[in-house]
């Protein structure tokens, strides 16, 4: 299968692999299957980094961050994979998404800081998001670009 071969080659050539996980046992089982398969094909497991998305308090989901880390360990080292980003699930994020307002443009918001840390890890440098140019009142009123 060409798609499978292409995906495998991309993984083998990657400097880093970011595995997005959530606080969900079913998702972690799927992620463990992926990690197990990569290990069996002699993939360099040191390339793997975790991104934990939609973090909620343990009491609301039944599984905490420590359990996520414990469930996903590097078989070569016996230690959890590095976590490069922890992105919380908040009502602000849901509201911004539903209103089609990019929350990431609010530089003081925790979500923006989390995304900035992730981008900095990926590009290997401090990342500063450019602010969009604000439209004039008339442009917003009449919908011009």
Task: Describe each PLM feature range.
Residues 1-82:
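Conserved catalytic-core segment of NTP-binding enzymes
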Residues 27-31, 49, 67, 85, ...:
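Generic hydrophobic/packing signal
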Residues 34-42, 58-66, 89-99, 124-133:
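Noncatalytic linker/hinge segments flanking ATPase motor cores
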Residues 55-56, 72-103, 115:
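Beta-strand-loop-alpha "switch" segments that mediate conformational coupling across diverse proteins
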Residues 61, 77, 86, 108-111:
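Short amphipathic alpha-helix initiation/capping segments at coil-to-helix junctions
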Residues 66-74, 95, 117-120, 140:
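Charged/polar, solvent-exposed surface patches and flexible loops
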Residues 98-145:
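NTP-binding/hydrolysis catalytic cores, primarily Walker-type P-loop NTPases
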């Amino acid at each position: 299968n060409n798609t499978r071969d292409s995906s495998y080659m991309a993984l083998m050539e990657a400097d880093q692999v970011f595995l997005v996980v959530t606080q969900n046992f079913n998702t972690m089982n799927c992620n463990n299957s992926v990690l197990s398969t990569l290990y069996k094909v002699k993939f360099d497991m040191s390339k793997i980094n975790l991104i934990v998305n939609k973090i909620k308090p343990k009491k609301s989901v039944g599984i905490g961050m420590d359990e996520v880390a414990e469930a996903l360990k590097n078989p070569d080292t016996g230690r959890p994979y590095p976590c490069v980003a922890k992105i919380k699930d908040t009502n602000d994020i849901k509201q911004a998404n539903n209103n089609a307002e990019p929350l990431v443009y609010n530089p003081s918001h925790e979500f923006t800081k989390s995304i900035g840390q992730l981008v900095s890890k990926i590009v290997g440098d401090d990342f500063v998001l450019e602010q969009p140019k604000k439209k004039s009142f008339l442009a917003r009123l009449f919908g011009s670009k």
